[in-house]
Amino acid sequence: MEQLHKLETMIAGWMKDLPHLPRNFTKWLAENAWWLVIIGVALGVLALMTTLSAMTVGSAVLGALGAPVLGGAFLISSVVSLVGAGISVVVEAMAISPLKTMQKKGWDLLFLSTLVSFAGAVVSSLVSVNIIGVVWAALAAAISFYILLEVKSYFGAKAKLAEKSAE
């Protein structure tokens, strides 16, 4: 967890000069994060099932067309995506209860989920030699980290102080 906090501090340093979201919006996001994550977990489970189906059909089709090497790369890339997304969905599901009570643990789990999702997307894109996929993964991670860092002050022991300073 110590390494996670070091990484959090480093990313926060990169984002410190960016403009902030409106206070009312960040407060709304923080207070409603738990049910937004429930929706994300449900959609994530559907995405996992879709990826599993695509793996089965895609590998069979590519293999039948005489492209076993391409089929193998597709299969490896899909497995990496499936594992990364699966871990991310499980970590997000673990974050729901702490997010509901505005605990820092919930925020930390969302941060970890974003890291896992980013790492899985990058590895999957590199295996399939999809450089644009790496760019999109970096863009999605940057937006996710920005939003997470904007709502961070509402979670944990410092949350009460942040709420008082907003009033």
Annotate each predicted stretch with a short phrase.
Residues M1-E167:
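Topology signature of small-to-medium multi-pass alpha-helical membrane proteins
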